[in-house]
Amino acid sequence: MFKTAGLQALGLTAVIVTTSSAQTIAGAANEFLRRSSVSIAVTQTRPIGTLGENIGLGYGVSGTYLFSVDSQGIFSLRADMAGAQYGNESKRSAFSETVGDRVQVRTRTSNYIFPMTIGPQLAWPTGPVRPYVNAGVGAQAFVTESDVEGVDDRLVIARSTNLSDAAFAWVVGGGITVPIVRRATRVQLDMSAQYISGGRARYLAPGSIVDLDGGQVRITSLESTTHLVMLRLGARVGF
């Protein structure tokens, strides 16, 4: 009888411990989600200095993840990643010398920049307009790719990376969020500007790749510091 009672007590204890652990894990997960938010925005990059002399404006999208260290959302950890295209060229040509002009393809060359940073953010989390400032460190990459695609269906037949490079970067910036619905503060309009100070990197600009006779190409890379201003307009959503 004592053995049976002991087993029952042990089983009950195991159930209580398991339930308590599950509740603790669920509570921690809910708290993590409650303190998390993401922002998706359309982005414009405005190169400055030597970079601005070599390339033009870029357009793309950016994503931001925020984790609030305190319960009010005053101090947060922020991670940003963006991708913008700052140049595009295309030309039509014969698929091959054997086929001739009966089958044509389009060669498209695109230039991209990818800033990635992480750091702290300070915000005023209440009111109709909520300002914030942020800083961070990271890197930004420059990539130029060429695709061969069908003229009509845009099906990519082949792809090649002409040049890729990256440099250390640091960022400072600020912006505002505005609740879109007065009582639904988990969805907010997000507008910001960031200054990104990038180190020296190699990159290509429109016109850097020249086709030569005999199927050869000449690639002239550029190199400079990579400073730019990034403007963002999007929406922030809390969980």
Predicted stretch roles:
Residues 13-21:
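Hydrophobic h-region of N-terminal signal peptides that target proteins for export
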Residues 22-73, 223, 230-239:
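Short glycine/proline- and aromatic-enriched beta-strand/turn motifs that initiate or cap beta-hairpins
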Residues 24-35, 69-76, 125-130, 180-189:
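Short loop/turn motifs that connect adjacent beta-strands in outer-membrane beta-barrel proteins
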Residues 29, 47-55, 82-113, 140-168, ...:
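Extracellular/periplasm-exposed beta-strand and loop segments of Gram-negative cell-envelope proteins
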Residues 36, 59, 75, 114-116, ...:
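Hydrophobic core residues within well-ordered beta-strands of beta-rich domains
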Residues 40-44, 61-67, 83, 116-124, ...:
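Residues on the lipid-exposed face of transmembrane beta-strands in outer-membrane beta-barrel proteins
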Residues 104-111, 120-128:
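Helix-adjacent hinge/juxtasegments
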